[in-house]
């Protein structure tokens, strides 16, 4: 929820509301600005993943609900773990990079997270479309480590990516 001055600024067109996050400028933020904006909204230990990381990389979809991973050490309190619903970073699956001082999953790890977790298939498909071409995604070895439900979701997302690529060939690479 925005404060009254923020709401007034948004209404007057001097700032933006990006999925509930306040951006104090009238233009859409660049990648480094998106990373900094998300960094202000997260605890210091949080690593954006899924739709949040996809939004930082592509600017497509919404960054909310904020999805994060947590480091193995130091361990978080059970209350904090429950509040953020943060899964643990796995070195075998996740590659973390730095964007404007914010740790974030790299594009390939973000794609795998979008394929296997989350709720919104359309948003995931759009973010994946801008992250990588479909040809590079299919048959990725990490896909073999997915559970049956994650694999089913991945197939639904990839089908939506194919539909988007056919419907909007001018935006595909």
Locate predicted features.
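Short gly/ser-rich loop at a beta-strand->alpha-helix junction or flexible surface loop bordering the NTP-binding
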Residues: 1-150, 159-173
């Amino acid at each position: 929820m925005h404060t009254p001055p923020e709401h007034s600024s948004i209404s007057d067109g001097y700032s933006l509301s990006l999925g509930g996050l306040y951006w104090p400028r009238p233009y859409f933020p660049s990648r480094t600005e998106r990373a900094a904006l998300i960094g202000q909204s997260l605890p210091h230990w949080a690593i954006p993943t899924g739709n949040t990381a996809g939004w930082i990389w592509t600017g497509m979809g919404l960054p909310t609900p904020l999805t994060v991973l947590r480091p193995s050490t130091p361990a978080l309190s059970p209350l904090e773990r429950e509040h953020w619903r943060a899964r643990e970073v796995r070195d075998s699956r996740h590659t973390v990079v730095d964007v404007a001082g914010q740790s974030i999953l790299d594009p390939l790890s973000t794609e795998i997270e979008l394929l296997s977790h989350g709720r919104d298939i359309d948003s995931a498909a759009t973010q994946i479309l801008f992250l990588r071409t479909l040809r590079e995604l299919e048959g990725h070895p990490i896909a073999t480590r997915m559970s049956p439900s994650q694999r089913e979701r991945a197939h639904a997302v990839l089908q939506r990516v194919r539909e988007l690529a056919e419907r909007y060939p001018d935006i595909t690479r």
